[in-house]
């Protein structure tokens, strides 16, 4: 609903001999049919210091990423990583999840990797690619390559973890954070689920 800038005042007779005044606001749509709300508050109006402090505490060590790696019956490797979403993110920030080689990477000659953690450190260390490169060019095992790549994240002041599978079906899930929800299932159906 929109109000006209010019409001009319009307007089009414409530009882004989007594006059009361009431204000009547005319409602109309401005040209083009768009409404302008003079009291629409900016988003900052609704944010309190207490709410922001609680959000900051909750997000401090929360990475909110989900990832998957897979080896199919034909020997193809795949990796997928999804970020924790838009809430609380800085405008213009690019995380590691969508960057191939940082938070996600798959190479049929080596391994598939999905990572979660401090995105800036994962980007600078190209963690997912580094894991595969250590296997291809140095002959490192999956577990050794993943741990070494994660050490580079720590050197940059970051924390996080990886899930990875190589072309032989070996799985590695190292992390240097307090914990990381993770699980795997092998070709025989054996499952592994862990947090710490």
Functional labels for PLM-detected ranges:
Residues 1-196:
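N-terminal nucleophile
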